[in-house]
Amino acid sequence: MALFPRGFYGSYGSDPSFTNLFRLLDDFDTYTREVQGSAPETGSRRHTQPTRTFSPKFDVRETEQTYELHGELPGIDRDNVQIEFTDPQTIVIRGRVERNYTAGTPPAQVAGVLTEKGEPHSPAAHHATVEDDVDEDNRSVATTATGANNQNNQQVAQRASAPTTEEKPKAPAEKYWVSERSIGEFSRTFNFPGRVDQNAVSASLNNGILTITVPKAKKHETIRIAIN
């Protein structure tokens, strides 16, 4: 992408070679993003989810001694952002935003619900009951199933002696009804019109704003060598 917007061409881009170069880079960057977004999935990639891409917004400011880039990267960890120079006057900023979720359409009966967690309650556990038998004298006698109790005791003993295995915790059942934040991979390229000092470049990420300061290289001064 060109370093300066199109409105900059008329006021400061007096050199036609720089103007054509900026426009060429800008058009190529736009074409590349469109091709990546509309490429069909064929073959083995049919069942894989395509990588989502987005383009963060940047402001570029020029001073007498530096170029300043300010980009919006909300919710991105600094470890997921890479800044590098591909040539002496071109800087590339790329990164990735990840979020695991399951998207869906909210049903009408749960309108307004943002997340759905938990599982349906299981039916009430069946409890053993005591049966009443009536003897010949019409007296109620409580009977217990001795054989069943012995069988239960054996099962408990077997469970106690068997080695216990740790169960993996289940992932929370969460579902996003609305997903509007940008996620995926991003890459921005800026080409500077003049020489820059790559060794003095500094960058910081605070409150979702990436700030990159690129000092301009000192102008080459002519040095005269005296002949003895």
Swiss-Prot record:
sHSP domain mapped to chain residues: 49-228
Region (Disordered): 34-53, 117-136, 144-174
Family annotation (PROSITE patterns): SHSP (PS01031)
Localization annotation: Cytoplasm
Cysteine pairings via disulfide bonds: none
GO annotation, biological process: cellular response to heat
Entries under InterPro entries matching the protein: A-crystallin/Hsp20_dom (IPR002068), HSP20-like_chaperone (IPR008978), Small_HSP (IPR031107)
Keyword hit for Oxidoreductase: no
Top-level taxon of the source organism: Eukaryota
Keywords: Cytoplasm, Stress response
Main location: cytoplasm
Keyword field contains Cytoplasm: yes
Cellular component annotations (GO), alphabetically ordered: cytoplasm
Similarity comment: family membership: Belongs to the small heat shock protein (HSP20) family.
Other comments on record: The N-terminal putative helical domain may be the site through which HSP30 binding to mitochondrial membrane is regulated.
PANTHER family (UniProt xref): HEAT-SHOCK PROTEIN 20 FAMILY MEMBER
The protein's name: 30 kDa heat shock protein
Organism: Neurospora crassa (strain ATCC 24698 / 74-OR23-1A / CBS 708.71 / DSM 1257 / FGSC 987)
Gene: hsp30
